[in-house]
Amino acid sequence: MKTAADTVLSPLMAADPGAPMITHYDQTMPSRIELSVTSTANWAAKIAGLLRDELGIMPGDVVVCDLPAHWLTAGVLLGAWWAGAEISTEDVDDAVVVTTPDRLDDHPADVETLLMTTDPMGRPLAAAGVEVPPGVTDLAEACRIHPDAFVPSGGGALALNGAALADLADTELSGRVLVPGLRRDDVVPVLARVFASGGTAVLVTGADPSDPAVADIAATERTTVTL
């Protein structure tokens, strides 16, 4: 079975591999980081390799993703899909958890846990000056040794919270989608819907959606819809 990541990435790679897939404006820095389709796929491949080859994730397994609005969240989402996993936004017994240090205490301590950096440049936690607690894995550090290409073992039937990829698709989200907000707890399902629809995303954090700067970003990035 074809993986959800292949379904998402193949047409984008065929159309224009250098086109932007995920753009992240952090107005608190301020910073702007943009990953092309190819760069996003490279991150996804490394994360898929980590999940399958080191953590034993197989098609149909569940990976819990509790992640903020950040460009690397796109890589985690697609990486899990490439490994054949279904993503859950709620804890599932014995499932691998991918989260950030500030959300670690919200999850069971007795499961395999990967911590995602929120550094603008994607630096591993220690390099960014963030302490890595014992018993958890620094995602950015651990995935670096894996290739930036991935050959999947197979796909799973479900993509997100019990829904198949096709069930997430929405033709209105097939363009450039603006996702603004001071703190978005729905970014994983939002990105899943955008990618399932063939769209790309512009994340804006650190600013209220009503901030005039957000409207300027929307105009600059030529977004077509706001979520």
What kind of region is each of these model predictions?
Residues 79-83, 187-202:
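Conserved short alpha-helical elements in the N-terminal third of ANL/AMP-binding
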Residues 86-108, 121-130, 165-176, 208-227:
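Conserved ATP-dependent adenylate/AMP-binding module captured primarily in the ANL superfamily
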Residues 41-64, 160-178:
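ANL superfamily AMP-binding
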Residues 29-30, 34-35, 50-52, 74:
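N-terminal pre-catalytic "stem/leader" segment of glycosyltransferase-like enzymes
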Residues 1-18, 212-216, 220-227:
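Actinobacteria-biased recognition of intrinsically disordered, low-complexity terminal regions
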Residues 11-35, 135-161:
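AMP-dependent adenylate-forming
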Residues 50-55, 79-81, 85:
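Short N-terminal edge-element motif at the start of the domain
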Residues 66-70, 181-184:
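Conserved AMP-binding
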